């Protein structure tokens, strides 16, 4: 039965192509470009940037309660679906230097993997793209865009972040990701509740 269905679909595709309809050229071009995944940083390289001089990086997995998910969502204006958040804590002589979260957010069609580095007070110190999978919008990795996040925190109105022509969806993805990271940090580390 599966073979008959495959033959039927192939026949429809061939017939549609012979009429000059049904198969847009941009689809195949888009698919070819998607295979060009850009890995900018490994996790190890990202931690070296996030925590220069650290003698240790600890991983802290935080399981979220319903109340924490709601609080994070209220701060970043998003529906939080995940049940766990993982923070990485860079330490020197046992003292936290800062925190980082590695997360993913969908650009146009594919996830952008990024790291948000936070100071102990919850303000953004750095944002780095680790892996970019979209054919367009890669300009979000440039310092001229990323530096806009420096100093922002969970109370920031992220609508002040300037967009990039031709990279609107990637910009939105990064804004969502950074605002979610700062909100999670505020709720989990600064709220005074365990």
Predicted regions mapped to residue ranges:
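Flexible, solvent-exposed loop/hinge segments and secondary-structure transition points
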Residues: 26-164, 168-172, 176-194
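Bacterial N-terminal signal peptides
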Residues: 11-21
């Amino acid at each position: 039965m599966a073979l008959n269905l495959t033959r039927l679909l192939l026949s429809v595709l061939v017939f549609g192509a012979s009429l000059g309809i049904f198969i847009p050229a941009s689809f195949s071009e888009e698919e070819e470009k998607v295979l060009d995944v850009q890995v900018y940083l490994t996790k190890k390289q990202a931690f070296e940037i996030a925590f220069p001089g650290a003698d240790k990086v600890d991983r802290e997995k935080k399981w979220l309660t319903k109340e924490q998910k709601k609080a994070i969502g209220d701060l970043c204006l998003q529906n939080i679906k995940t049940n766990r958040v993982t923070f990485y804590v860079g330490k020197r002589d046992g003292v936290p230097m800062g925190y980082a979260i590695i997360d993913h957010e969908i650009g146009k069609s594919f996830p952008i993997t990024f790291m948000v580095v936070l100071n102990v007070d919850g303000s953004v110190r750095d944002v780095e793209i680790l892996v970019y999978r979209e054919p367009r919008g890669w300009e979000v990795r440039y310092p001229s865009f990323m530096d806009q996040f420096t100093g922002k925190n969970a109370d920031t109105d992220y609508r002040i972040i300037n967009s990039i022509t031709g990279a609107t969806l990637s910009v939105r993805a990064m804004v969502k990701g950074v605002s979610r990271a700062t909100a999670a940090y505020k709720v989990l580390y600064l709220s005074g509740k365990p």
